[in-house]
């Protein structure tokens, strides 16, 4: 139920004056809001991850007022940094590297985050089948020459589609090469020398070999290829990517522009100057947010965006997504020798890739006795394809399998997961058939409708460097022009 005075009229009044008399409550969706519970801004950003924080800072720097609504207790989303309490050394559980582009360097300079070239700690890799703990004698093991040739050939194919460097902007009809399984694409053009490196840089996409090619190209754009083949990635100089979001919190917090532990429960999105209205449940009670524009910077899975007043077209498109599970645990007492990296492989699969769901890799960190363990699942319609407890149990089982099958190489210990981060739902994607039917053209056509803009990994890829570029070039100009 709405009050006798329409919500539209109230909203127009609010946008004009940004003040409601304290003794005259505004009733929206059956709730009464007094002035102290009404927040008026130019833009509301739903989602305080990498994309939401970035666009909020950009908007504030452009002189626009903004408020970020974040469901969790912190900003940063997929970014998570483990700090050892004894040594204060750190290890990343999410965002690790950046591209050396102006979109990255300008933004992080603005936040006073120094960057440095990446350096790799020496480690020795061993291949084991973590289903059994037994060693794997790889049958697929490309030479350095094959690796270089694979990426050179891939770059030549990628150059046919320069628009992919800006987003999933596809020619129509969509070429068959872009919708065929990625493994078949690499084989067709004799690019398999690059396959293992591509797989190891992009866990969490589900079945790597059967992904539609363009879904992998979203990640493997020209900047990523250049960084991987030259090793010229950047990292935060203090080895703490979470510091970015501490700084963002300071920037936005100075203008009371962040609502943590807060969740949208109701939204009204309209065309024209009426703008948008959101009811948000916060630790201090429900707040009414009134703004000219809305930015949605959370995964557009239906169970996530249901309260955001979706149109029929949005429901139809977002309902087509599948995603994969991607998980990172910090583990000690592994029994693995120091500076030893364990890659999960299989003797009986194409390219010796592991059978998912499974651990992908166990990577030694700069913290003595602590390994970062990465796990992933196959694609699923479910937003959380693999339950956290099941993933954790599989990590412990995998380590114990190594110990049992190789008592001469691994100490018999009781592994302990000391930090945990789930990145699910990860790498939202669609089928080849949906790509052929124009899914991405329809998706991008949503930008700006009903005073709403979108950014985040689904609109680009799980790579902050590329998300920030996409936001700077494809979202912000139109958004700012409408304010």
UniProtKB/Swiss-Prot annotation:
GO biological process terms on file: terpenoid biosynthetic process
Glycosylation sites: 100, 137, 190, 240
Keyword Signal: yes
Coiled-coil zones: none
Cofactor: FAD
Gene3D superfamilies xref list: 1.10.405.20, 3.30.70.1990, FAD/NAD(P)-binding domain
Keyword Iron: no
EC number in record: 1.21.-.-
Name of one Pfam family that matches: Amino_oxidase
Signal peptide as annotated in the record: 1-21
Keywords carried by this UniProt record: FAD, Flavoprotein, Glycoprotein, Oxidoreductase, Signal
Pathway(s) the chain acts in: Secondary metabolite biosynthesis; terpenoid biosynthesis
Function text: FAD-dependent oxidoreductase; part of the gene cluster that mediates the biosynthesis of the sesterterpenes ophiobolins, fungal phytotoxins with potential anti-cancer activities. The first step of the pathway is performed by the sesterterpene synthase oblA that possesses both prenyl transferase and terpene cyclase activity, converting isopentenyl diphosphate and dimethylallyl diphosphate into geranylfarnesyl diphosphate (GFPP) and further converting GFPP into ophiobolin F, respectively. Other sesterterpenoids (C(25) terpenoids) are found as minor products of oblA.
PANTHER family reported for this sequence: AMINE OXIDASE DOMAIN-CONTAINING PROTEIN-RELATED (PTHR10742:SF419), FLAVIN MONOAMINE OXIDASE (PTHR10742)
Family statement: Belongs to the beta-cyclopiazonate dehydrogenase family.
Annotated protein name in UniProt: FAD-dependent oxidoreductase oblC
Species annotation: Cochliobolus heterostrophus (strain C5 / ATCC 48332 / race O)
């Amino acid at each position: 139920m709405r009050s006798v005075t329409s919500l539209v009229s109230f909203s127009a009044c609010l946008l004009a004056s940004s003040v409601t008399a304290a003794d005259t409550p505004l009733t929206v969706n059956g709730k009464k809001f007094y002035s102290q519970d009404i927040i008026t801004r130019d833009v509301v950003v739903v989602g305080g991850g990498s994309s939401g924080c970035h666009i909020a800072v950009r908007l504030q720097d452009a002189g626009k007022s903004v408020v970020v609504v974040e469901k969790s207790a912190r900003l940063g989303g997929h970014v998570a940094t483990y700090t050892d309490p004894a040594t204060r050394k750190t290890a990343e559980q999410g965002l690790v590297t950046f591209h050396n582009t102006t979109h990255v360097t300008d933004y992080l300079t603005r936040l006073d985050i120094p960057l440095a070239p990446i350096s790799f700690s020496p480690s020795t890799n061993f291949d084991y089948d973590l289903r059994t703990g037994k060693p794997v004698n790889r049958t697929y093991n490309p030479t350095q020459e094959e690796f270089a040739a694979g990426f050179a050939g891939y770059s030549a194919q990628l150059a046919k589609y320069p628009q992919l460097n800006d987003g999933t902007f596809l020619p129509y009809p969509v070429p068959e090469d872009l919708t065929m399984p990625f493994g078949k694409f690499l084989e067709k053009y004799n690019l398999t020398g690059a396959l293992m490196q591509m797989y190891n840089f992009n866990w969490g996409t589900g079945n790597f070999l059967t992904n539609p090619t363009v879904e992998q190209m979203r990640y493997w754009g020209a900047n990523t290829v250049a960084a991987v083949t030259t090793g010229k990635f950047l990292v935060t100089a203090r080895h703490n990517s979470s510091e970015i979001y501490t700084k963002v919190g300071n920037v936005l917090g100075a203008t009371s522009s962040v609502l943590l532990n807060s969740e949208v429960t109701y939204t009204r999105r309209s065309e024209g100057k009426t703008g948008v209205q959101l009811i948000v449940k916060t630790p201090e009670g429900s707040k009414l947010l009134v703004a000219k524009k809305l930015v949605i910077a959370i995964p557009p899975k239906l169970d996530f965006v249901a309260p955001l007043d979706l149109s029929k077209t949005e429901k139809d498109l977002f309902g087509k997504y599948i995603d994969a599970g991607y998980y990172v645990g910090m583990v000690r007492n592994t029994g693995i020798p120091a500076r030893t990296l364990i890659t999960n492989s299989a003797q009986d699969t194409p390219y010796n890739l592991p059978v998912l769901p499974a651990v992908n890799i166990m990577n030694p960190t700069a913290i003595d006795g602590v390994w970062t363990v990465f796990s992933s699942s196959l694609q699923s319609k479910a937003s959380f394809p693999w339950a956290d407890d099941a993933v954790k149990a599989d990590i412990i089982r995998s380590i114990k399998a190594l110990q049992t099958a190789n008592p001469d190489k691994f100490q018999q210990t009781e592994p302990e997961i000391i930090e945990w981060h789930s990145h699910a739902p990860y790498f939202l994607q669609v089928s080849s058939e949906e790509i052929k039917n124009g899914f991405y053209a329809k998706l991008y056509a949503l930008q700006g409708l009903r005073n709403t803009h979108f950014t985040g990994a689904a609109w680009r890829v799980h790579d902050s460097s590329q998300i920030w570029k996409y936001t700077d070039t494809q979202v912000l100009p139109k958004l700012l022009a409408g304010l």
